[in-house]
Amino acid sequence: MLKHAAYPTLAEAVRHVAAALDVRVLANPKACDRMDRAAATGDFDLDLFEELVEDMLYRPLESLGDEPFAYELAAVMRGWRRQYIPIVGRVSSDALPRHELLPLLVEYVFAGWVADVLKHLEHVGLIRSAWLMAGSGQGLCGDPPALPVATVIQAFLWQYGAASNDAPSALYAQPDDGTRDRSTEQVSRWMSGSTLPSLGSIRLVVATAVSRPWFRATHWKGARDEFQRELLIARALQYSASLVAPYGDFLQMVRAELQERRLVDIGLLISRAVYARGEPMGLSLIGLQTAHALDFRDAKTNSQLNEAEALLDEFRAQARHLDAPWAVEWMVTWCEARLAAWRSDFKTSMELYETAFATSVYRSGREARNILIEALTLAGSLGKRPHLKRLIHQGKALDILPRVLGDLEPQPWNGRLIADILTKCYAPHFPQPTSLSPRSSPQGMRTTNEVKPADAAG
């Protein structure tokens, strides 16, 4: 459904961090499957996100014996969600495919977020220096810039008096014949950036290093965990940089943010890119006209519905010919859901509303809230408690749940109450079945014509 989602989903973010730290191998296979499904569907369920952070990040890191890092990383991911959701809910990336949106997100959102995380970890004493983790942006004597893994290893050796021009040989005891063993060559490849260390190889090199005489004579309590933690974070940074390499030097972006944190209106940058595309924006306007023709602020005659259906057919046909048809699929589906509701096909309408909402949170901006309101209204009318619960949790995660609902939670008895509240406030002519059957006859429909909609901008 969200194969072409412009924004990386929440579950994709968890999956990326788990892969960057190489801790997926320590996670429960069922949790991995749940994460992959959520990444594909783009589910914004807050409870699911919390479970994924717990199962995919906190517990694997805790099993390594590094509970402080596990705790801080879980807290950081929760904080990231609170920063990221407003961007998704506020900024319309309508008509921007992922390959056009990601460069903006990488440079103006993700790099700054990583810099903030490194500063936080330094502040709480889990790493020695944020600058150390970002690598050296300038090499010595014409050498290429040092990568994070290389700077961490060199700093570790220097701290314990084992600094050497041949860092890999300093970590491992060398054979008497002067040759370099396989492990030493492996570390050389890490430091050059030709390969990334795995979690298992990091644990092995840490165990080897802390057994050397120069370390045992000078180390402090917690030094082993610090070295392993810094190597994991350095690996994660290089892993991320390799994935976004087509969009620029990510490590240099992070270093720039460490030097001076920029305040950028990402919404303005995305809007400029959207308007530069031209044609899709015009098509979006046609879609909004179609949606307006099917809204629930006033009653509709059969003639008006037929005209709206013809407009929808035209909108759907034009959308298929876009270079990026997924840019307006949420709007097409939303209009189809509204038309199905007017035609009393409530079962189909419910399915379409859920699809429209799931795709709209990535591209529609504020319209996602309107879709959520209508989906909640229909789910309440049909007594669909699982749908209500899921939609309410997603609305809370996106911070777009109507304030008129307060802290109301879906119960077996209050579905109709939720529907009535939303109908009176937002959609006075929303068709509602008098029974819980998926499809009711026109005679079974009722509207609250006598109710004047409240000014419920919240």
In which residue ranges do the predicted regions lie?
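Extended, non-transmembrane interaction/recognition domains
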Residues: A74-M133, D177-R182
